[in-house]
Curated annotation (Swiss-Prot):
It catalyses: UDP-N-acetyl-alpha-D-muramate + L-alanine + ATP = UDP-N-acetyl-alpha-D-muramoyl-L-alanine + ADP + phosphate + H(+). This is UDP-N-acetylmuramate--L-alanine ligase. The lineage of its organism: Bacteria, Pseudomonadati, Pseudomonadota, Betaproteobacteria, Burkholderiales. Cell wall formation. Pathway: Cell wall biogenesis; peptidoglycan biosynthesis. Transmembrane segments: none annotated. The keyword Cell division applies. It comes from Bordetella avium (strain 197N).
Length: 468
């Protein structure tokens, strides 16, 4: 690629899926520039690394580029896209550029509706602990690396494969992990679950004849596609027939302890005694996927256990912000704050269950900002059911993510339905900007607050200390 393409420009470079690819290309020696609508910690970090970042989109930003990279969030009438097409500069989808990066290494791609970012991070961390020095491109910030991407000197590249727009079908990994298959982003698949499953089958068919698939045996939809996977399979989970299986699972605060039995191709491998620095059964499954990959690649058992015990987490995945003071009007004291990206009912249920396991005797308060009107509509009853499992709920208006409002699929409708269900009396806070003060007025000593959503609620944790 480099003999013809030297300067690559990213439209929307601050996006989680874009910034990592840009950083790796910069470290490979390419000239990389990018633009975004607003400045952020991501764009500032990229600028510090030497990437030229423009705030705002303008035709002149692409004047010297040999190729421009776009994500599905970038519209066709973007001035940089128009200018590139007029100048016959190639306009490359993000997933296609990621596929080009993967051609330089042996690719390990993590797909699935939930758990991709954490699983990708765990795989990268375990391989790094085993001395394999992988390159990785992740959809979230790996805390131990301080970044969501890193260029390693080893032969493997570990990437997060995005099914939301079916772009994961551009990738050509040698190992494919599927964590689960659930109904989300169904506009892409014509609201047809069969088409969604077919896409995951096709994803495994992109593997070479010497490739392999690592599949979660606990997920019913993943089990359904197994007969159609034509490559060697390693299954993982808590199911009795999983080849990499967790037993004796116990919560220890925000850590999990469990034993792992592993069926080898010729003989069983030694049982591992694992301490995972993450809470919840869903994270036990994510760790099992990483263990399956590492065992296949010959990573030493001690390195696997060390990486999992010392895992420092991923940004906005059950991120603990510490304790904050309770207002004197509420009796004083302290409450704990957790920040989480979860925005689908399945993810929310897993996070709430993890919190219950970590703090069984404390009040769990959920502050939730729904993400997209279409998801709120499609998962409405499931949202009501999951929200009702919290001890108390603060609910904001939907974060639109560019969508037009839908009747009976907004935050008020969710609050009404939750009230009718009778399990919890929600506090509706229409403007998320008012949420920090609402939280201060609501919390009591010993409470655990979980701030959850994929939108602007991510800014709230840093605002809670103000005026406390």
């Amino acid at each position: 690629m480099k003999h013809r393409i030297q300067h690559i420009h990213f439209v929307g470079v601050g996006g989680s899926g874009m910034s990592g690819i840009a950083e790796v290309l910069l470290n490979l020696g390419y000239t990389v520039s990018g633009s975004d609508l607003s400045e952020s910690t991501v764009t500032r970090r990229l600028a510090d690394l030497g990437l030229k970042v423009s705030i705002g989109h303008a035709a002149e930003n692409v004047a010297d580029a040999d190729a421009i990279v776009t994500s599905t969030a970038v519209a066709g009438d973007n001035p940089e896209v128009i200018a590139a097409r007029l100048a016959r500069i190639p306009v490359v989808p993000r997933a296609v550029m990621l596929a080009e990066l993967m051609r330089l290494k042996r690719g390990i791609a993590v797909a699935g509706t939930h758990g991709k970012t954490t699983t990708t991070s765990l795989v990268a961390s375990v391989l790094a602990a085993g001395g394999l020095d992988p390159t990785f491109v992740i959809g979230g910030r790996l805390n131990s690396a301080g970044a969501n991407a890193q260029l390693g000197q080893g032969e493997f590249i570990v990437v997060e494969a995005d099914e939301s727009d079916a772009s994961f079908l551009n990738l050509l990994p040698v190992m494919a992990i599927i964590t689960n298959i659930d109904a989300d982003h169904m506009d892409t698949y014509g609201h047809d679950v069969a088409r969604l499953k077919s896409a995951f089958i096709e994803f495994t068919q992109r593997l070479p004849f010497y490739g392999s698939a690592v599949l979660c045996a606990d997920d019913a939809n993943v089990r359904e596609i197994m007969p159609f996977v034509s490559r060697p399979i390693t299954t993982y989970g808590l199911s009795s027939d999983a080849q990499v299986r967790a037993e004796n699972v116990q919560a220890d605060g925000t850590r999990m302890r469990f034993s792992v039995r592993r069926q080898g191709r010729e003989q069983d491998l030694p049982t591992l005694e694992v301490e995972l620095n993450l809470p919840g059964l869903h994270n036990v499954r994510n760790a099992l996927a990483a263990i399956a990959v590492a065992s296949e690649l010959g990573v030493a058992d001690a390195a696997i256990c060390q990486a999992l015990a010392g895992f420092k987490g991923v940004g906005r995945r059950f991120t603990q912000w510490g304790e904050f003071p309770v207002a004197e009007a509420q009796g004083g004291g302290r409450y704990s704050v957790i920040d989480d990206y979860g925005h689908h009912p399945v993810e929310m249920a897993a996070t709430l269950a993890a919190a219950r396991g970590a703090w069984p005797d404390r009040r769990i308060v959920l502050a939730f900002q729904p993400h997209r009107y279409t998801r709120t509509r499609d998962c409405f009853e499931d949202f009501v059911r999951v929200l009702g499992t919290a001890d108390a709920v603060l609910l904001t208006e939907v974060y639109a993510a560019g969508e037009a409002p839908l009747v009976a699929a907004d935050g008020r409708a969710l609050a009404r339905a939750l009230r009718v269900a009778g399990k919890v009396e929600p506090l509706f806070v229409e403007d998320v900007a008012a949420l920090p003060q609402a939280v201060r007025d609501f919390m009591r000593d010993g409470d655990v607050l979980i701030l959850m959503g994929a939108g602007s609620i991510s800014k709230v944790p840093s605002q809670l200390g103000e005026h406390a």
